[in-house]
């Protein structure tokens, strides 16, 4: 029977993580459980850095970006001996189950702990929206708002100078954030990792737009696809139009979470406690068609496929 749980945030931070922690803590306390917060993700778990959390520990947290528990990347957690120390620390504290908030690397750690017999529930916290088994991740919509605001500002100056702007958006190997920002920001062109990319084809599309009378343009591109400064130079050379690159960077991870992320994080945090009390372990939470769902965390990591939002790309192209 579960009497005490632990909660940690791991990997890259995302707006709404604090709201998720709050959802976990207050739901657990309502059910009569104790909650331990673990500092700095799996690193803090290994180093046994924990704190008892009460309902006041998460007061005024729902609107705060980042994660007050902190986060850290800890690749050493792949080592089974390191994980064994972590489990010993959990048991020493009387913790019966663990809620992990983070991305796919965080899920991998939760999966390994599950395989070693310690029950974990994973919540998807990443701006990249690249987690299997869920339509959206905690932090995605806040990051989208940040990116669109930046695109709006760039459009102001691009139109003033009849300039082409290349905007690099986060997402790692998932184009969801770029696609959504391209639609919401009215970008003329979008480049994502799921679709083969050619600089020459992009330039030809830009030239076609210029021939139709377009005076300025925004190109949204997902990070890691190319050097955006070199791409901007190539576009300027081939089109004769002044072109500048903007890397939005880590500003996309910060800021107060938008209402949808606060709601999603709160619902998922509460649902994690429901699952643990129902006897579930080794699960990850998602939202599909606005309904909370849960999947086997091992199956989600190893077997499930994440569909590419091709309809978003089609929409973006129709609106060029």
Curated annotation (Swiss-Prot):
Substrate binds at residues 126-128, 163, 170-172, 223, 244, 250-253. Allosterically activated by ADP and other diphosphonucleosides, and allosterically inhibited by phosphoenolpyruvate. It is an enzyme of class 2 (transferase). Pathway: Carbohydrate degradation; glycolysis; D-glyceraldehyde 3-phosphate and glycerone phosphate from D-glucose: step 3/4. SUPFAM superfamilies: Phosphofructokinase. Its EC number is 2.7.1.11. This is ATP-dependent 6-phosphofructokinase isozyme 1. It comes from Escherichia coli O127:H6 (strain E2348/69 / EPEC).
